């Protein structure tokens, strides 16, 4: 991929109030193609694509290694100050690990030199314990070389997710407040229940396995139309834009942790 990394998907408005920069990490296919369809979100929006794509790219250190490398990339465009991080599918998990690493290193430099994570945006990023092997069907129009790279990335990403154990947070801290954007339909297109059970009703919907995690960090579950693989398609992107913007604004304002 010839795009810069990170790639500025949408610039902040030249006039008026600007929100904290949003950095979206690639999905399991390793690309940021889906994010390129997003509209203006009132802030700089960056995308990070896989720095080790294709058959020769291997992440021996798993998601933790990926998060550390991408954090260094983020600091080349947003060296300090408030920031929102997140991503679709694998990207949400990597952003979660990235935030944990930042919490672990907090205090190693002055506050003026640190990034401040206002929150995370997970776009249908399931807890690894609920991961499914169902694959994305790629369109015939994709060039063979790109198809091969994406398929390799997807295979490796599935293994990375299987191997990732969601860690405990450093003592005295907890995960940043998180907005969970959840697909309304399962992978076969069947509508999912808005509320899975009484215990999840306080979060306005299913949390895709995160309710069992030791930290209560998901502040809101936002329904977005489509399946896991179709939420960025033309018929759904307009609604996703609106809900992603609203999620960013919620994190800009600050939510109770």
UniProtKB/Swiss-Prot annotation:
<comment type="pathway">
    <text>Antifungal biosynthesis.</text>
</comment>
<keyword id="KW-0378">Hydrolase</keyword>
<comment type="similarity">
    <text>Belongs to the AMT4 thioesterase family.</text>
</comment>
<dbReference type="GO" id="GO:0016787">
    <property type="term" value="F:hydrolase activity"/>
</dbReference>
<dbReference type="InterPro" id="IPR001031">
    <property type="entry name" value="Thioesterase"/>
</dbReference>
<dbReference type="Pfam" id="PF00975">
    <property type="entry name" value="Thioesterase"/>
</dbReference>
<protein>
    <recommendedName>
        <fullName>Thioesterase frbE</fullName>
        <ecNumber>3.1.-.-</ecNumber>
    </recommendedName>
</protein>
<dbReference type="InterPro" id="IPR029058">
    <property type="entry name" value="AB_hydrolase_fold"/>
</dbReference>
<comment type="function">
    <text>Thioesterase; part of the gene cluster that mediates the biosynthesis of the antifungal antibiotic FR901469, an inhibitor of beta-1,3-glucansynthase, exerting antifungal activity against the pathogenes Candida albicans and Aspergillus fumigatus. FR901469 is a cyclic depsipeptide containing 12 amino acid residues and a fatty acid chain. The NRPS frbI contains 12 modules responsible for the formation of the depsipeptide backbone which is denoted as Acyl-Thr-Ala-Tyr-Val-4OHPro-Thr-Thr-3OHPro-threo3OHGln-Gly-Thr-Orn-OH (C71H116N14O23).</text>
</comment>
<dbReference type="GO" id="GO:0009058">
    <property type="term" value="P:biosynthetic process"/>
</dbReference>
């Amino acid at each position: 991929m010839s795009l810069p990394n990170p790639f500025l998907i949408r610039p902040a408005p030249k006039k008026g109030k600007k929100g904290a920069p949003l950095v979206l990490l690639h999905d399991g296919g390793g690309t940021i193609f889906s994010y390129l369809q997003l509209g203006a979100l009132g802030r700089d929006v960056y995308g990070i694509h896989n720095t080790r794509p294709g058959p020769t790219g291997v992440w021996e250190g798993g998601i933790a290694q990926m998060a550390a490398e991408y954090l260094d990339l983020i600091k080349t465009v947003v060296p300090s100050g408030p920031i929102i991080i997140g991503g679709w599918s694998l990207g949400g998990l990597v952003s979660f690990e990235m935030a944990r690493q930042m919490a672990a290193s907090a205090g190693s430099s002055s506050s003026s030199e640190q990034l401040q994570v206002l929150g995370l945006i997970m776009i249908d990023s399931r807890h690894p314990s609920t991961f499914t092997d169902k694959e994305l069907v790629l369109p015939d129009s994709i060039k063979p070389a790109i198809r091969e790279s994406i398929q390799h990335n997807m295979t490796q990403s599935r293994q990375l997710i299987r191997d990732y154990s969601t860690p405990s947070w450093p003592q005295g801290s907890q995960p940043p407040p998180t907005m969970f954007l959840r697909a309304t339909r399962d992978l076969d297109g069947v509508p999912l229940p808005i509320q899975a059970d009484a215990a999840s009703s306080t979060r306005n919907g299913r949390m895709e396995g995160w309710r069992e995690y030791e930290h209560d960090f998901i502040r809101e579950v936002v329904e977005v139309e489509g399946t896991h693989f179709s939420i960025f398609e033309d018929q759904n992107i307009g609604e996703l834009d609106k809900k992603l913007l609203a999620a960013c604004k919620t994190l800009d304002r600050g939510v109770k942790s």
